[in-house]
């Protein structure tokens, strides 16, 4: 289901719940602590142009080509922004997976007139999956995949309260443990990786809440989240295995490192929120 469809459904539901809320007193207060949660859809940004980059000389720059003994590009067939379904680009690739996101949260708001400001702490899980595949002329495939194990966020909130509803903007820091994996059809070389990564990033967006009762609110929230994996890149190192010394991965320095070209793991999140207020 597309983000626009989720947004429309959520907005319609919120409007339905908001009708009785708007009939409440204009003096409805939002100040105080709250606990709650959210559930929604996480959709990844378009990464069709992503590729795999290589370091054949060991300088850490990942700016080399993997060439055959005849100086031809061993990865001339190209790349795709997904998981391969065959050994050639023409076989196609599976689209990256969008999935559910669910979180628990706690926060505190302060109200001054119609202005409400505060903070929210949030933690949860995300079922999205992001892959990129490189195709070699052997032909073989090399697929790098990442998923979020869990994420934590600390965000500020600033909003405007009116007749039982709160409209707000939010933004702050985000942290995630990212699970990485590697698959290949190459059974000749050896492959080792540096495992999972822990990435910092940021998140921002906005939303609306309506009070259905004095101590209970329901809302709709959109967030754009970016985790930057650049400081803790997932790297796959290619070794000799049983390959000949003329193997393209081995010609320059006896081995090659590979990683994905885009270290940013970005997504759009839209979800329903609920909170118990004290």
Residue ranges and their predicted role:
Residues 2-7, 16-278:
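Gram-negative outer-membrane beta-barrel domains
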């Amino acid at each position: 289901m597309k983000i626009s469809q989720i947004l429309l459904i959520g907005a319609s539901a919120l409007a339905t719940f908001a009708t009785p809320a708007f009939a409440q007193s204009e003096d409805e207060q939002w100040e105080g602590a709250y606990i709650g949660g959210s559930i929604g859809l996480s959709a990844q940004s378009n990464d069709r142009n992503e590729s795999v980059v290589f370091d054949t000389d060991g300088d850490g720059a990942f700016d080399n080509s993997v060439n055959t003994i005849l100086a031809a590009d061993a990865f001339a067939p190209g790349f795709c922004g997904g998981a391969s379904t065959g050994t050639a680009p023409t076989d196609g690739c599976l689209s990256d997976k969008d999935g559910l996101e669910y979180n628990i949260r706690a926060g505190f708001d302060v109200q001054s007139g119609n202005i409400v400001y505060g903070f929210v702490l949030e933690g949860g899980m995300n079922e999205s999956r992001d892959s990129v595949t490189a195709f070699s002329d052997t032909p073989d495939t090399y697929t790098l995949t990442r998923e979020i194990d869990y994420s934590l966020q600390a965000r500020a909130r600033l909003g405007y309260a009116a007749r039982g509803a709160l409209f707000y903007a939010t933004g702050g820091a985000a942290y995630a443990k990212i699970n990485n994996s590697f698959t290949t059809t190459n059974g000749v070389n050896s492959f080792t990786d540096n495992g999972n990564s822990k990435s910092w990033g940021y998140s921002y967006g906005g939303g609306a809440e309506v009070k259905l009762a004095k101590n209970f609110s329901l809302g709709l929230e959109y967030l754009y989240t970016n985790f930057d994996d650049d400081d803790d890149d997932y790297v796959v190192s290619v070794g000799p295995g049983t390959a000949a010394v003329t193997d393209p991965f081995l010609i320059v320095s006896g081995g090659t490192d590979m990683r994905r070209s885009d270290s940013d793991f970005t997504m759009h999140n839209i979800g329903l929120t609920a909170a118990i207020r004290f």
